[in-house]
Regions:
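DE-rich, low-complexity intrinsically disordered acidic tracts
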Residues: 1-2
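Primary recognition of N-terminal secretory signal peptides and signal-anchoring hydrophobic helices
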Residues: 5-194, 199-221, 243-255
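SH3/SH3-like beta-barrel fold
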Residues: 114, 212, 227-232, 240
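Glycine-centered tight beta-turn/hairpin loop motif at sheet-sheet or coil-to-beta transitions
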Residues: 118, 233-235
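Conserved glycine-centered beta-strand/turn positions repeated across beta-sheet architectures
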Residues: 207, 219, 228-230, 237-240
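Long, low-complexity, Ser/Thr/Pro- and Asp/Glu-rich intrinsically disordered
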Residues: 232-233, 255
Length: 255
């Protein structure tokens, strides 16, 4: 029997891409690449933390070189101090309201007075001297300064008659005064982190903390999830992510 003849296989023709199609394909590829890039950029901008640093003078509301912000315990005051010749001077009204109401500013006589149980302390504007009863004493700095209708007293002088602690920093000028003592809530930074002006990763950074830095925990004006309001060791009040800090512990503040 004669073997069946094998039918030759038909060769498939390879489709060649028309030269006219290349520009279209390149354009489509570019559209995909640009679209992917724009999507990635959008997602990055939406979910990545801002690295913007807020200007310290703007945050503290400082308008000139000798102006100084005042953090009184856990509150940033609207009142401003003066930083002159390396010393902190508080407005006499700030002293009266927040530190010691027994100090009195006599604007008529330009005298600053303090009543001891049996004696009167008196100091004049621009003077390094002060009197206790009839005795004259001296400091190595100007105790009382005037600026228009305002008077400013050296914080070191107030400290001689009042129990409080204070610490100050420059650039920007700010002073932290502590008059409330006892047990305070604190947290510790678990890693290097940013403290922001408000609770949000897109909010400007006030300052940065390192691993192990301690911060005071402050009451929040409203309940905010995942963030804690803190006062940093360098005098900034802001917000830090909860996942970046330890659990709350207690510390004692002594005079």
């Amino acid at each position: 029997e004669e073997q069946a003849k094998r039918r030759p296989r038909k060769r498939r023709r390879r489709r060649r891409i028309s030269p006219q199609a290349f520009p279209v394909l390149i354009a489509l590829a570019l559209i995909v690449l640009v679209g992917g890039f724009m999507t990635g950029k959008f997602l990055y901008n939406k979910y990545s933390p801002s690295k913007e640093m807020m200007d310290g003078n703007e945050y503290f509301g400082l308008s000139d070189d000798d102006s100084m912000a005042v953090i009184m315990n856990n509150e940033l005051l609207e009142d401003k101090a003066k930083f002159i010749d390396g010393r902190v001077y508080l407005n006499v009204e700030t002293v009266y309201q927040y530190i010691n109401s027994r100090f009195y500013w006599d604007s008529t006589e330009n005298l600053y007075l303090y009543a001891l149980p049996t004696e009167l302390v008196s100091v004049g504007v621009g003077s390094t001297d002060y009197t206790v009863a009839k005795a004259t004493n001296s400091e190595d700095y100007v105790i009382l300064r005037a600026d228009g209708s305002d008077a400013y007293v050296a914080l070191d002088f107030i400290k001689e008659y009042t129990a409080f602690n204070y610490e100050y920093w420059e650039e920007p000028n700010r002073v932290h005064v502590i008059t409330e003592f006892g047990s305070k809530d604190v947290v510790t930074a678990q890693k290097a982190s940013a403290v922001r002006n408000k609770a949000g990763i897109k909010c400007p950074i006030l300052t940065k903390v390192n691993k192990g830095d301690t911060m005071y925990v402050l009451d929040e004006p409203e309940e905010i999830d995942e963030w804690t309001r803190v006062l940093t060791a360098d005098g900034y009040i802001g917000y830090i992510k909860d996942k970046r800090i330890s659990a709350v512990t207690k510390t004692e503040i002594a005079a």
